[in-house]
A protein has these predicted regions:
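Canonical Radical SAM [4Fe-4S] cluster-binding loop centered on the CxxxCxxC motif
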Residues: 1-19, 214-219
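A short acidic, helix-capping loop that chelates divalent metal ions and anchors anionic groups
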Residues: 4-10, 104-110, 173-174
Length: 275
C-alpha cells in the first residue's frame, strides 16, 4: 500500500513499492509457490500505489492459481480501473474488501477525505465486471444504528459478503469524535499460549517501504518498534521461542489464547455471506 502519512515520523518519505522492486523481492519461483497474495494498507491505501495494477498482473500471470485480494476505502481511481481489476481478479476466491463504515452521512467520520459517490461508483463497477466484493464495517457510536441498512445496501449492490466488527481504535488512537458503540467493553487480557496467526497460515508481511516482517501487527508499528522487538525481529526463531516465557506485547495482545479462542478469532461480530 502507498504510505501517504507516517504518524510516527512526519519526515518519512511516502513509500511505494514498484513493480521492479516486487519482482526482485518475489521472483517467479517464489510467486509460483504462493497460495495467496493480498494488499492491505497499515498506513496507506493499496489502490493509490502507482504500480498496484501491474503488481497484481505480475502475480496473476506468474501463478494462474494464486488467490488475489485487496482491502481498500474504495474512494480512489476511476471506474475503468476497477473494471480492469475485476478482470485480473478472475479466480473464484479472489476478492476486494471495501472498508465502508456506515452510509453517506457517517462513513467519512472515520474514513477521512473519502467521497461517498466515488466509493459507490467504484464498487458497482467492480461488481458489474465480475469482481467479488466484501463490505467490511467498523462499528462506532456514530454508525451503530446503520448496520442493518449497510447490510441491505451491500446485498442490493451485489456484494458477496458483509462483515461488521467493533474496533478498538478509539482506545489505541483516541480522537474526540470516535466513541465505542453502546454496551461495548474491552476484552480481557489474554494470558494463554501463543497461537500465531501468521505462522498458522504460513504468511509474511511486506511493508510499502520494503521491510519484511512476520505479520501486519508488527507492520502496524514498523516506525515505532521498541528495542526488544527489533532484537526479536532480527531472528524470527528467537521470536517464536519467546512465546514460551516472555512473549512480546504485540504477540500477547493479538494471538494469545483463552478458553474462547484468540483475540484474532473473536474480533468479527457479524459475518454473513450475501450470495
Amino acid at each position: 500500500a502507498r504510505e501517504n502519512i507516517n504518524l510516527y515520523d512526519p519526515a518519512e518519505h511516502r513509500s511505494d513499492l514498484s513493480l521492479a522492486q516486487c519482482q526482485k523481492l518475489f521472483d517467479q519461483k517464489f510467486v509460483a509457490g504462493l497460495d495467496k497474495m493480498f494488499m492491505c494498507g497499515n498506513f496507506g491505501e493499496p489502490a493509490a500505489a502507482d504500480s498496484a495494477m501491474d503488481i497484481f498482473k505480475y502475480f496473476r500471470t506468474t501463478n494462474s492459481n494464486i488467490t488475489l485480494g485487496m482491502n481498500t476505502n474504495g474512494s480512489v481511481r476511476n471506474t475503468a480501473w476497477w473494471r480492469e481489476l475485476a478482470q485480473v481478479f478472475n479466480r473464484p476466491l479472489d476478492y476486494v474488501v471495501f472498508s465502508i463504515d456506515g452510509l453517506e452521512d457517517t462513513n467519512h467520520v472515520y474514513r477521512r477525505n473519502t467521497a461517498w459517490h466515488k466509493i459507490v461508483e467504484n464498487a458497482e463497477s467492480f461488481v458489474a465486471a465480475g469482481g467479488s466484493a466484501h463490505w467490511d464495517m467498523l462499528i462506532y457510536e456514530h454508525n451503530q444504528h446503520q448496520i442493518d441498512q449497510c447490510r441491505q445496501l451491500a446485498r442490493d449492490m451485489g456484494f458477496t459478503w458483509f462483515r461488521a466488527k467493533v474496533s478498538k481504535r478509539f482506545v489505541t488512537t483516541p480522537v474526540h469524535f470516535l466513541n465505542p458503540p453502546d454496551g461495548y467493553s474491552l476484552p480481557n487480557t489474554k494470558t494463554g499460549a501463543i497461537s500465531c496467526h501468521a505462522m498458522n497460515e504460513q504468511s509474511i508481511y511486506v511493508a510499502a517501504n520494503g521491510h519484511v516482517l512476520p505479520c501486519c501487527w508488527f507492520g502496524g508499528e514498523v516506525f515505532s518498534l521498541d528495542a526488544h522487538a527489533q532484537e526479536l525481529l532480527s531472528d524470527w526463531a528467537q521470536l517464536s521461542r519467546s512465546w514460551d516465557h516472555a512473549p512480546h506485547r504485540i504477540c500477547q495482545a493479538t494471538c494469545a489464547e483463552d478458553t474462547q479462542g484468540t483475540s484474532f478469532s473473536k474480533q468479527w461480530k457479524i459475518e454473513e455471506q450475501l450470495k
